[in-house]
Amino acid sequence: MGGSGNWIRSLISNRKPVNDQQEKLSDKSSKKKWKLWRISSESLASSSFKSRGSYAASSLGSELPSFSADEAFTTAMAALIRAPPRDFLMVKREWASTRIQAAFRAFLARQAFRALKAVVRIQAIFRGRQVRKQAAVTLRCMQALVRVQSRVRAHRRAPSDSLELKDPVKQTEKGWCGSPRSIKEVKTKLQMKQEGAIKRERAMVYALTHQSRTCPSPSGRAITHHGLRKSSPGWNWYDDVGTFSRKSSESSVLSEYETVTVRKNNLSSTRVLARPPLLLPPVSSGMSYDSLHDETSTSSTSQSPVAFSSSVLDGGGYYRKPSYMSLTQSTQAKQRQSGLSCNGDARRSAGSDQCTDLYPPGNVWAKSQRS
C-alpha cells in the first residue's frame, strides 16, 4: 500500500509543470503571426508532434477530475490534426504569379500612356499653321502638274487629229449622211469643194494684188500684204510678231541713211543723208537748196539710182534695192508710157512711177509725203 501511495503523490506533484508547459505553448501559438514564406513542412511536423504529445498528456490527465477545463483546447487540436496538410509551395507560386502580373500590367499601362501622349503631340503638329500652309502649297503644285500633263497630252493628240482632218475619207466618215451614194461620188464632191476654195483664194489674191498696184501709198501696200498673209491658210500670229520685230530692228539700222530728192528748175537729183531728215516745210520751186546740200549729179530726164546692199523693207515705208536690180532704159520707157495712161502728173516726173514699178526707189514715199 505504501508503494501505491507514493506513486499517486508523484503523479500529483508532476501535474503542475505539465499544465504550465501547455499554457506556455498555447500563449506562443496565439502570439505567433501567420507568415507564408516562413512556414515550412518541418514546422508543421514539429507542431503536429507537440500537439500529439500534449494530447497524450491531456489524455493521461483526463483521468483526473480537475483536467476537465482543457477539453476545449484538446478538441481543437484534434480537429487540426485530422485536417489534411496544406501545400505551402503552391501558395508561394500563386503569390509570385500575382506579383508578376501586377508588374506586367503596370508596364503596359506606362507604355499606353506614352503612346497616347505621342498621339496628342502628333495631332497638335498636324493641326498647326505651318503644316496646313505646306499642305496647301503641295496641293497647288500637284494641280499645276496635272494641268501640264493635260496640256502635253492634248499637244500629243493634236497631230493625230490634224492628220484625221486632212484625210478626206475620215472627213466623209465624220460628216456621213444617209443618202445612197458611192465612195467615188463622195470623193469627187470633196475634190470639187477643195477646188472651189482654191479658186476663191486665188481670186482674192488677184484682187488684192491689183488693188495694191493701183494704190500709190506704201501703207496701203503694207496693209494688203498683211491681208494676203493673213488670208493664206498657213498664217500664224507668231510669224507676224517675228517679222515685225525683224522689221523694227532693220529699220533702226537703215534709218541712218535716207534719200532726198531735190528739184530745181525741172532738174532732179538724189541725195543720201547720214541721218533721217527732219520734217521739212513745203518749198517752192524757185527756192535754192545749195545752202542745205551740195549737188553731186544732175539729170534732165532720169534719176540716179542709189545702191544699197540691204534687204527690202515692206512695212517701214522705205524701199531700197541693190544696184544690180535697177531698171534698164527700155523698161523705163515702157513704164513711162504706161505711167502716162495711169496718171497725168507722171509726165512731169523724171523717174519711174510708183504705180507700175516692180522695184520702186526709196524716194517715192518722200515725194508722196511732200505732195
From Swiss-Prot:
SMART domains: IQ
Positions of the IQ domain: 93-121, 122-144
Subcellular location field: Nucleus; Nucleus envelope; Cytoplasm, Cytoskeleton
Region described as Calmodulin-binding: 125-141
UniProt biased composition (Polar residues): 297-308, 327-341
GO CC list: nuclear envelope; phragmoplast; preprophase band
Family to which this protein belongs: Belongs to the IQD family.
SUPFAM superfamilies named in the record: P-loop containing nucleoside triphosphate hydrolases
One GO BP annotation of this record: cytokinesis, division site positioning
Protein name listed in UniProt: Protein IQ-DOMAIN 7
Residue ranges with Basic and acidic residues bias: 17-29
Stored Pfam families: IQ
Organism in which the protein naturally occurs: Arabidopsis thaliana
InterPro entries in UniProt: IQ_motif_EF-hand-BS, P-loop_NTPase
Keyword terms: Calmodulin-binding, Cytoplasm, Cytoskeleton, Nucleus, Repeat
Role this protein plays: May be involved in cooperative interactions with calmodulins or calmodulin-like proteins. Recruits calmodulin proteins to microtubules, thus being a potential scaffold in cellular signaling and trafficking. May associate with nucleic acids and regulate gene expression at the transcriptional or post-transcriptional level.
Segments for region (Disordered): 1-32, 285-308, 327-371
Quaternary state and interactors: Binds to multiple calmodulin (CaM) in the presence of Ca(2+) and CaM-like proteins.
Gene Ontology molecular function, alphabetical: calmodulin binding
Residues spanning the membrane: none
Chief localisation class: nucleus
